Regions:
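Hydrophobic-ligand-binding modules of eukaryotic lipid transfer/binding families
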Residues: 1-16, 22, 100, 128, ...
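Short, surface-exposed coil-to-beta transition loops
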Residues: 10-12, 62-66, 86-90
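Hydrophobic ligand-binding cavity/cleft-lining segments
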Residues: 1-49
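Short, hydrophobic/aromatic-rich segments at coil-to-beta transitions
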Residues: 46-53, 71-80
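Short Gly/Pro-enriched turn/cap motifs at secondary-structure boundaries
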Residues: 5-6, 80-84
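Beta-strand elements of well-folded, non-transmembrane domains
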Residues: 17-19, 58-60, 71, 85-87, ...
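Beta-strand/loop substructures that line and gate deep hydrophobic ligand-binding cavities in soluble
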Residues: 83-135, 140-142
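Generic structural detector for well-ordered beta-strands
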Residues: 14-18, 45, 55, 68, ...
Length: 149
């Protein structure tokens, strides 16, 4: 698993998965599955076409940002937060030579209220997001390799 982070509130993680890229991409691209594999996502409420409300556990308590899908392709999805959080995320699934795939997650986030953003930085929101991202891709790997999709 590869991990890197840039400026505050930014995470980039990769995970090799021994499952067909098209199966992994189809599972990930259905955002309703987020609560099954994204650690910290407690619920996903569909609001309309390509719009959802998530309930997330965070270092400062539960938050419920709106999410809008901005890209929904065969090998990648990306989204932006529409409330509570600024930023978004992207998951890309690339086939490898052995019949598996490489899953890449990048995310950038800042709480919209500066006071909460400062508090989140003080309690380690970036480390929390990185750890949850690593655990999420490990969970996705397990689900896909165990064929639980």
């Amino acid at each position: 698993m590869g991990v890197s982070s840039g400026h505050s509130g930014s995470v980039s993680i990769e995970q090799l998965v021994a499952a067909p890229a098209e199966k992994v991409a189809a599972y990930v691209s259905d955002f309703r599955n987020a609560k099954e594999w994204m650690v910290g996502v407690e619920s996903v409420e569909p609001l309309g076409e390509d719009s959802y409300r998530l309930t997330l556990e965070s270092p400062i308590g539960k938050i419920a940002p709106g999410v809008r899908m901005v890209e929904h392709g065969p090998e990648s999805i990306s989204w932006v937060y529409t409330s509570s959080i600024e930023g978004g995320g992207r998951v890309e699934v690339s086939p490898d030579d052995g019949g598996g795939c490489l899953v890449s997650y990048t995310g950038e986030f800042h709480l919209k209220r500066k006071l909460f953003d400062r508090a989140a930085r003080l309690v380690g929101a970036e480390r929390f997001a990185r750890t949850n991202g690593e655990r999420s891709l490990s969970r996705l790997k397990y689900l896909m390799e165990a064929r639980h999709y």
